[in-house]
Amino acid sequence: MNYELVFLAAGQGKRMNAQKNKMWLELVGEPIFIHALRPFLADNRCSKVIVVSQEEERKHVKELMSQLNVAESRIEIVKGGSERQYSVAAGLERCGTERVVLVHDGARPFITLDIIDRLLIGVEQSKAAICAVKVKDTVKRVVKGVVQETVDRENLWQVQTPQAFELPILRKAHQLARKEQFLGTDEASLVERLPCPVAIVQGSYYNIKLTTPEDMPLAKAILGELGGIAND
């Protein structure tokens, strides 16, 4: 099954305490951007990549693409919005070649082809599929610094990206969210409101999102453990 990819690279890096977009921070000699994008470029089923970036960084994205010898016909760069959701919507406007679209956060550099495989099976069966891992830690609900309850973690999952959807469903979900002025934290939260069942497939505990400075040493350790190749 072929798919198009909306690749989000318009982050600000504020929580990373970086002076630039965290996508351009180096991880073992290469930008996080390249680590996160390479598995999709290596997947022949990925027919098109829509990179959503800040307007002032388009030139830098193009330079990186040329270094990776990616055909221009396979890449399109679009301007991101003020919120993640608006950036995804901008990317979706440029989709339409394939029935299925994947959305991925560029700050997750350890995606694997195995996860992509599971997502494509999931979206074929359920029209919407996300990857996730079971919560390991004890979870508390806290109000004003005081524990209110211990949450049963049996049915709790930590959601990751990529997330996979049939394109018409994700577009419809974005249209509804815009109409109702709903702002979600991921695509699945929009699709759930249609309503539409969203299937879960197994992600990876290695598939972390690089958000704060503490994540960088962990990322280097993961890359070392994987031998530079993100396999489950």
UniProtKB/Swiss-Prot annotation:
**Source organism superkingdom:** Bacteria
Q: Which gene encodes it?
A: ispD
Assigned keywords, A-Z: Isoprene biosynthesis, Nucleotidyltransferase, Transferase
Instruction: Offer one example of a GO biological process linked to this entry.
Output: isopentenyl diphosphate biosynthetic process, methylerythritol 4-phosphate pathway
Site annotation (Positions MEP for the nucleophilic attack): which residues?
153, 209
Q: What HAMAP family does this protein's entry cite?
A: IspD
The chemistry this enzyme catalyses reads: 2-C-methyl-D-erythritol 4-phosphate + CTP + H(+) = 4-CDP-2-C-methyl-D-erythritol + diphosphate
Q: Tell me the function of this protein.
A: Catalyzes the formation of 4-diphosphocytidyl-2-C-methyl-D-erythritol from CTP and 2-C-methyl-D-erythritol 4-phosphate (MEP).
Name assigned to this protein: 2-C-methyl-D-erythritol 4-phosphate cytidylyltransferase
List the molecular function annotations (GO) for this entry: 2-C-methyl-D-erythritol 4-phosphate cytidylyltransferase activity
- PROSITE patterns on file: ISPD
